[in-house]
Amino acid sequence: MNSKQILSLSAFAMTIATAAAGNWNAGDTIALLIGIAMFFVLLLALLGWISRKK
């Protein structure tokens, strides 16, 4: 799997997870934002690691 497939699969999984939640409150919103931020940081770390390997 390349990085584009992983990114699209992760975005799809986040969409399904948010659509499945029935009652949405502030805690869920904060958790979603933290999860997106962590995913973004990990994605950049992975891209940096790959670029240093080459």
Swiss-Prot record:
Membrane-spanning segments: 30-50
Record localization: Membrane
Main subcellular location of this protein, as a coarse class: membrane
Keywords, alphabetical: Membrane, Signal, Transmembrane, Transmembrane helix
Membrane topology, as annotated: Single-pass type I membrane protein
Topological domain spans for side Extracellular: 22-29
A GO cellular-component term linked to this record: membrane
Topological domain spans for side Cytoplasmic: 51-54
Signal peptide annotation: 1-21
Protein name (Swiss-Prot/TrEMBL): Uncharacterized transmembrane protein DDB_G0282757
Organism field: Dictyostelium discoideum (Social amoeba)
